[in-house]
């Protein structure tokens, strides 16, 4: 074998080994499967490795509490803490809400049709909407409630909620231009997507007054209560708001139920309701058995702390007057125009019921003493008969 033959054979063997190695190279195989060149795949791998290292470094730096300067350099800031010592509304914003809401309420009660219903839904919510709907429906047979909201062109803003959580509230007072009793209004907003609407309105009971709240710029806090989404135990008050309203509802029942150590002072509204129940029972005694029960509407209770540490408690009771007609008897209901308008029935042979909402506001002392009724209103909202 000549020298030239030896060199040629050696070169051929080297090429064979190189081709064999290339065929077995993992990177080359991967590149072939991805339809990339081997060098391109290597570059991609390097970029991925560098990116992962950078991300890990940033995460470690951001999570280290001592790296304040690094946080600032990277633009990292702690989320701001919720402000619990100021009002979510300015005075001007609250007054604009009152103007918008009262305007819608006025239009809803002074117009008719679908537009009127839409205005009422804009102005009222919950039991407030049930009450005003009943009032509008019975306007032709029922004495008008002390003037419409807009007869008091400048509502007095008494309080707004504190903090930026929910629910939020506004408390306002109006005085009718014809000299009627002042009316307390509670407006609520349950969440960020729902505007403020009137939850309840009630005439003040003479000689009651409303003690001052904290300044409007700081807002007034809700007091914890036994029921409802916003309230838990009534700490710091002479009686828990839920307990107060449940006992008040129980003592107004007919037949009467004795309440020992009532946490509230006797008031003219309760006396009037009980007298009406006794009169109704006497009027139908020979024809039907009459009962009356009162129950607190779930989640209707709002207790707002005042500057003195006392609280103003808002709540709604649902009253049900029931008539069980005795066998062989008929009850003529023509005289009860509201019942006839709601049910279309002028004669009842089996049973009948009337549902009335009672809007009440109490002043509850901070530690000792009895609660005092500040405002009250009742409104028939439904009836049934057979």
Positions of PLM-derived features:
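Core segments of small alpha/beta cavity-forming domains
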Residues: 84-140, 211-290
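Charge-rich, low-complexity terminal tails
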Residues: 54, 63-72, 266-316
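Surface-exposed, charged secondary-structure patches
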Residues: 139-182, 288-334
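Solvent-exposed, non-transmembrane segments of extracytoplasmic/periplasmic domains
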Residues: 120-123, 129-153, 161-167, 173-176, ...
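C-terminal region of N-terminal signal peptides and the immediate post-cleavage residues
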Residues: 58-82, 86
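Short beta-strand edge/turn micro-motifs at domain boundaries
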Residues: 67-75, 178-243, 306-314, 324, ...
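Secretory targeting and sorting signals
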Residues: 43-67
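Long, intrinsically disordered low-complexity tandem-repeat segments
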Residues: 1, 6-41
